[in-house]
Amino acid sequence: AGETWADSYACRLRWMQYCAGIWGYSTTNFTECAGFSGSLYSNYVNAGKYARHIPYYVKTNMPEQEAAYSDLTEVARILLITKGIQASDVYGSLVYTDGWGTRNGNVEILEPTFQTQEELLTTWNQELKEAANKLATSSNQVTFKNYDLAYSGDMSKWVKAANAVRMRIALRLLKQKPAEAKAIAQEGLSSGNIFSSI
């Protein structure tokens, strides 16, 4: 409930002028609140710690089962990118490719490189595409359906989620790179069956 409040009601809805009240918020509609934007960044950093540690942990401790944990790794990547988009909307450049080095066994990168939002969107689009393809074609996976609060381990729904997040990327690119945005949207819509169940 806290993230829904901060992200939707208290922040975005009023910034987009969908509603005008300032309940629960002591400044004007157009004043940035560090508490809300800080929580988006914290959520991104925390998601990254786990998303980057999962494949490293499996590779280090259970190398013979690495292929069986592909779905878990890709779902974590989708969640991390979703959080990254939210944080990048507020902060712009973020650490991503070089981030969480000690969590993925790369202890040599002590000063990771920040990437611009444009670079991040390109990277994230490609990674979401890869994640959707891997989830759609994987077999003999360790199940985590009892821990998957979103889709109860249904990987076809995670494929749709990956393609839906690609739609977010297309929307962010629409004014600056309309041809690229259109290509992403068409590819995502055709490959993800996003609207097949509506």
PLM features per residue range, with description:
Residues 1-17, 38, 53:
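Acidic, glycine-rich segments characteristic of secretory precursors and extracytoplasmic regions
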Residues 4-11, 92-95, 181-182:
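Beta-strand acidic-aromatic groove motif in beta-rich domains, primarily in extracellular
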Residues 102-109, 147-156, 198:
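Carbohydrate-binding/catalytic loop surfaces
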Residues 89, 93-95, 148-150, 154-157, ...:
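Residue-level preference for alpha-helix termini and adjacent loops
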